[in-house]
């Protein structure tokens, strides 16, 4: 119930108008429910900390929207959407999207539509005391807003990267209500909501109907969804922390000053993971374009070896998280491949063999009950010295006699071993060593350790790293600093053309790559 919703310490409500943007109804792992609720209710931190802005534009759809503003607006007028300088990859992506948008929505003289000068907003004023102490509720939409000359027809075109799963019913219902009842402009007779994918130009109709049908859709799906947004209580540390105005008062985000071994107080707040670090080391532009979520090439992203590795991880995660923890055995189902993965017969057979090898080193032999196991948990720490939110997702955290153990699992098709130092080969283990050595995972330090499990056709290797051994900690700290230092001071993310371009999943958007067409 809304009565039990409470803000954290350190915030002040500055408005009695509740404003909800339609995107909040989508939810998902990249949104924080508690932050959305605070934002809708008009809360601000009591002592806001000035933040430095990024030099480059980081809103992936912003330049596309700005280009559409120029295309549809009066000559010489600046676009409504303001953007910063563009990275080469974002410019290429945006130009690609505009070209496909014009092809998907050609001008129709028989049914002319014009862009409205101001997006619609639905306003509602409670007739009596409001449980959330609001004088007014507002729902807003974002996208390309078009209407017929007489205003009887409204259409909202929602730009997305690709057409994925359908958005939640509550999202579509809220948008339909704004189109049907929002101002400015006369009430329409019909409304339409359509998604447009910048990647391939495909469109998908989410709703089309009369004004009354739109209102009925909201009555069916909207109120519960709205309450879910307004009364969100879950703090969800993760990638959203990078731009969160409530980070300094968040009760769920743990701080880890000095974790990365660098210090700078004049840099934009950012997020970082070992995956980002690897991508940046290969090519700064590659990491930046991945962070922008530019579409990747399936021929690279879902290459069969990588796909087999992800399928094995998904199988083990489900097995380890299911019910009472029981050690895995050599009995592997013939149809072991989880839903969503497509492997050829020889890869399925190899995967089954590797899973049987896992039984000999399954960590569930050491746990007491389900509370001792965390499969792919989200480990998030704010390094306040660097102002970087560090993100990690170990394959498994398990408790051995009260001590937390960080387990990473890898696969190999050969029995050859590398001579390269372990913490350099697998930087996620370096992060694990530093976190455990600092006591950030809690628990009894006596048996706390990091483990690397490598599944091979001939058997399983299990490497154990003592995080409290001085040499291991020094090496781990050095590995992290080396991965982070240059990236932390970089504002341009210049491409670094070379052999890695051949296996770059975002090469299509990079004009510096000589293999961009092949990667597409």
Predicted regions, residues:
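Hydrophobic multi-pass inner-membrane translocation pores used for secretion
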Residues: 254-256, 266, 274, 280-295, ...
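Charged, glycine-rich intrinsically disordered N-terminal tails and low-complexity linkers that flank
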Residues: 1-92, 252-333
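Well-ordered, non-membrane alpha-helical segments in soluble/globular domains
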Residues: 171-176, 219, 349-355, 430
């Amino acid at each position: 119930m809304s009565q039990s919703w409470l803000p954290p310490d350190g915030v002040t409500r500055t408005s009695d108008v509740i404003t909800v943007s339609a995107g909040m109804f989508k939810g998902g792992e990249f949104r924080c429910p508690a932050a959305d609720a605070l934002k809708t209710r008009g809360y601000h931190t009591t002592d806001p900390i000035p933040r430095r802005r990024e030099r480059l534009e980081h809103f992936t759809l912003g330049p596309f929207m700005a280009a559409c503003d120029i295309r549809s607006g009066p000559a010489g007028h600046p676009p409504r959407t303001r953007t910063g300088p563009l990275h080469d990859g974002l410019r290429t992506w945006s130009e690609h999207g505009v070209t496909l948008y014009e092809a998907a929505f050609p001008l129709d003289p028989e049914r002319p539509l014009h862009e409205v000068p101001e997006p619609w907003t639905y306003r509602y004023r409670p007739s009596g005391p409001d449980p959330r102490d609001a004088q007014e509720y507002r729902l807003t939409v974002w996208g390309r807003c078009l209407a017929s000359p007489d205003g009887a027809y409204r259409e909202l075109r929602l730009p997305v990267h690709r057409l994925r799963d359908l958005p939640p019913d509550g999202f579509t219902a809220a948008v339909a209500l704004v189109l049907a009842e929002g101002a400015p402009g006369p009430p329409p007779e019909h409304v339409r909501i359509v998604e447009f994918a910048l990647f391939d130009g495909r469109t998908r109709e989410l709703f089309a109907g009369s004004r009354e049908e739109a209102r009925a859709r909201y009555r069916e799906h909207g109120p519960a969804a709205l309450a879910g947004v307004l009364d969100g209580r879950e703090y969800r540390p993760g990638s959203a922390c990078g731009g969160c105005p409530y980070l300094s008062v968040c009760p769920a985000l743990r701080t880890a000053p000095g974790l990365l071994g660098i210090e700078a107080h004049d840099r934009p707040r950012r997020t970082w993971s070992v995956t980002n670090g690897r991508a940046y080391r290969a090519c700064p532009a590659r990491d930046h374009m991945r962070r922008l979520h530019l579409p990747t090439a399936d021929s690279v992203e879902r290459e069969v070896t990588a796909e087999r590795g992800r399928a094995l991880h998904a199988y083990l995660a489900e097995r380890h998280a299911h019910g009472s923890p029981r050690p895995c055995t050599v009995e592997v189902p013939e149809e072991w491949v989880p839903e969503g993965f497509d492997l050829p017969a020889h890869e399925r057979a190899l995967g089954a063999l590797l899973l049987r090898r896992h039984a000999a080193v399954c960590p569930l032999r050491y746990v007491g009950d389900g509370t001792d196991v965390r499969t792919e948990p989200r480990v998030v720490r704010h390094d306040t010295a660097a102002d970087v939110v560090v993100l990690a997702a170990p394959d498994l955290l398990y408790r051995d006699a009260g001590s937390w153990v960080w387990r990473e699992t890898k696969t190999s098709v050969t029995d050859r071993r590398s001579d390269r130092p372990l913490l350099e080969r697998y930087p996620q283990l370096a992060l694990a060593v530093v976190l455990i050595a600092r006591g950030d995972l809690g628990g009894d330090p006596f048996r706390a350790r990091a483990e690397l499990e490598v599944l091979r056709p001939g058997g399983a290797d299990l490497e154990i790293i003592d995080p409290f051994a001085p040499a291991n900690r020094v090496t781990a700290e050095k590995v992290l600093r080396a991965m982070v230092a240059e990236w932390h001071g970089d504002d341009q993310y210049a491409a670094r053309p070379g052999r890695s371009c051949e296996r770059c999943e975002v090469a299509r958007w990079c004009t510096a790559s000589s293999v961009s067409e092949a990667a597409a």
